[in-house]
């Protein structure tokens, strides 16, 4: 069905969500314009070479674009976590009892470039670079740009402009627009483990590496050039914090003391530490996601989350696919092919999109914060490791009945809210199964009791 639009759909933000949505809608023939504040050729890529974990949810959206195989060429499979202890002992924790399941490490910049390249091939999609959205006029459905100071007209506006969204900033001035933001007391800084000779990997390439140290931690994800992008999650203030590590000598000694194996592999550590920015970790919630068919929020603009389930990008891509599916729902289309799409039709689409996404977005936001404390405090803990072993045992012995929360989040497309509910039940099962097993002996796990507990808590 041909859709008539008097003005283009305008997407604010040409990042991952904005580019993916422009690609999908553009492939269907919608006239699209994308306003992106950054230049077409990003500068200082290394300082912003943030890596992301791509899971099944994101892969599903990329598959819909038709370019998933091309995109996975720049990704590296990660089969589990590699935990680095203070004495440099490494312990591998598989993500799943199924060895065929894995996450992908992918550079945000490279992924964004691929999506944008494919989108720019479409004649009905136009990018406007180096021009930020300053504000929007909700009544007129227009955008005032910051750099060129022009007024851009749109049939509808889709805000994909991140956690500090200018589109959302205009919406929160409305009556009955809920909004909240919550910061962790930790921030993060990107660092690097370079490749070895001939672009070899200096630590295991198929793992997400974690150095848990109680009140702080460091992680590292592999790059296709053999390097690793490291992220230090660290308190902003306190005896050991970003504020206290204020000299090269202090930083050098800190990494020698707390990350001795990584320290030996980071020749540019001090330059990276003082040149790269320290960024905050924020959870953002707002409701509603839309206003009268004139504007809708997608991804971080609607629900920024902390990165500790590796789901920020995946949740945003899931938003994109859900919104696209709503655009494809013919029951929401104009009844006549010669009638232009109007605000009523967009409003129907956006209402359905929010109904399907809000509870799930809230769920993953809450679980991401929980997982921060798990990764920081417990991944090196003996009881935590034992529970993981028991969980894998249950997945093998009861494959259709017991599925871990992590499995549901990372290796399925089941709703996040469902994964949260199942995760609570799973914890009750695990707590009862390990009770009294003080020597953490997997052979002592009572599978008959496990069967009874699964029936009791999961109704399976």
UniProtKB/Swiss-Prot annotation:
For the biological process aspect of GO, one term held by this record is:
NAD metabolic process
Annotated compartments? Mitochondrion
Cysteine-cysteine disulfides: none
Q: Which domain of life is it from?
A: Eukaryota
Catalysis: reaction(s): L-kynurenine + NADPH + O2 + H(+) = 3-hydroxy-L-kynurenine + NADP(+) + H2O
Provide a Gene Ontology MF annotation, just one. FAD binding
Q: Which InterPro entries match?
A: FAD-bd (IPR002938), FAD/NAD-bd_sf (IPR036188), Kynurenine_monooxygenase (IPR027545)
Which pathway is recorded for this entry? Cofactor biosynthesis; NAD(+) biosynthesis; quinolinate from L-kynurenine: step 1/3
**Chief place where the protein resides:** mitochondrion
Q: Name one GO cellular component term.
A: mitochondrial outer membrane
Q: Which cofactor does it need?
A: FAD
- Name the keywords, alphabetized: FAD, Flavoprotein, Mitochondrion, Monooxygenase, NADP, Oxidoreductase, Pyridine nucleotide biosynthesis
Enzyme Commission identifier(s): 1.14.13.9
Q: Which family does it belong to?
A: Belongs to the aromatic-ring hydroxylase family. KMO subfamily.
Function text:
Catalyzes the hydroxylation of L-kynurenine (L-Kyn) to form 3-hydroxy-L-kynurenine (L-3OHKyn). Required for synthesis of quinolinic acid.
| Protein name per its UniProtKB record | Kynurenine 3-monooxygenase
Report the gene name: kmo
């Amino acid at each position: 069905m041909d859709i008539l639009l008097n003005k283009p759909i305008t997407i604010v933000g040409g990042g991952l969500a904005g580019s993916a949505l422009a690609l999908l809608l553009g492939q269907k023939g919608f006239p699209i314009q994308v306003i992106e504040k950054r230049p077409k050729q990003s500068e200082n890529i290394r300082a912003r070479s943030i890596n992301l974990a791509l899971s099944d949810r994101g892969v599903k959206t990329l598959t819909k674009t038709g370019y998933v195989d091309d995109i996975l060429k720049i990704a590296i499979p990660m089969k589990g976590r590699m935990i680095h202890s203070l004495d440099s002992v490494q312990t591998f924790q598989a993500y799943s009892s199924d060895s065929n399941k894995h996450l992908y490490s992918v550079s945000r910049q490279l992924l964004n470039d691929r999506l944008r390249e494919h989108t720019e091939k479409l004649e009905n999609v136009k990018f406007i670079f180096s021009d930020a959205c300053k504000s929007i006029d909700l009544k007129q459905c227009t955008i005032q740009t910051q750099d060129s100071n022009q007024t851009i007209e749109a049939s509808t506006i889709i805000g994909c402009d991140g956690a500090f969204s200018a589109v959302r900033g205009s919406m929160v001035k409305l009556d009955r627009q809920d909004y909240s933001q919550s910061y962790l007391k930790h921030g993060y800084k990107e660092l690097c483990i370079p490749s070895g000779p001939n672009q070899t990997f200096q630590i295991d390439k198929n793992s997400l590496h974690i150095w848990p140290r109680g009140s702080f931690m460091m992680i590292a994800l592999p790059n296709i050039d053999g390097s690793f992008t490291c992220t230090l999650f660290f308190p902003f203030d306190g005896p050991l914090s970003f504020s206290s590590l204020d000299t090269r000598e202090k930083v050098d000694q800190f990494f020698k003391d707390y990350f001795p194996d990584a320290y030996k592999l980071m020749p540019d550590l001090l330059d990276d530490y003082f040149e790269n920015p320290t960024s905050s970790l924020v959870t953002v919630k707002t409701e509603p996601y839309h206003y009268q068919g004139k504007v809708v929020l997608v991804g971080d603009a609607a629900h920024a989350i902390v990165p500790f389930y590796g789901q920020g990008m995946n949740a945003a891509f899931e938003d994109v696919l859900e919104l696209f599916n709503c655009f494809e729902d013919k029951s929401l289309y104009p009844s006549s092919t010669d009638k232009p799409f109007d605000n009523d039709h967009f409003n129907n689409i956006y209402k359905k999109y929010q109904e399907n996404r809000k509870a799930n977005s809230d769920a993953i936001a809450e679980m991401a914060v929980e997982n921060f404390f798990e990764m920081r405090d417990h991944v090196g803990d003996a009881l935590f490791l034992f529970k993981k072993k028991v969980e894998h045992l249950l997945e093998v012995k009861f494959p259709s009945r017991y599925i871990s929360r992590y499995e549901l989040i990372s290796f399925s497309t089941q709703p996040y809210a469902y994964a949260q509910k199942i995760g609570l039940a799973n914890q009750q099962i695990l707590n009862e199964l390990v009770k009294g097993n003080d020597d953490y002996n997997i052979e002592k796990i009572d599978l008959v009791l496990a069967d009874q507990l699964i029936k009791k808590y999961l109704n399976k």
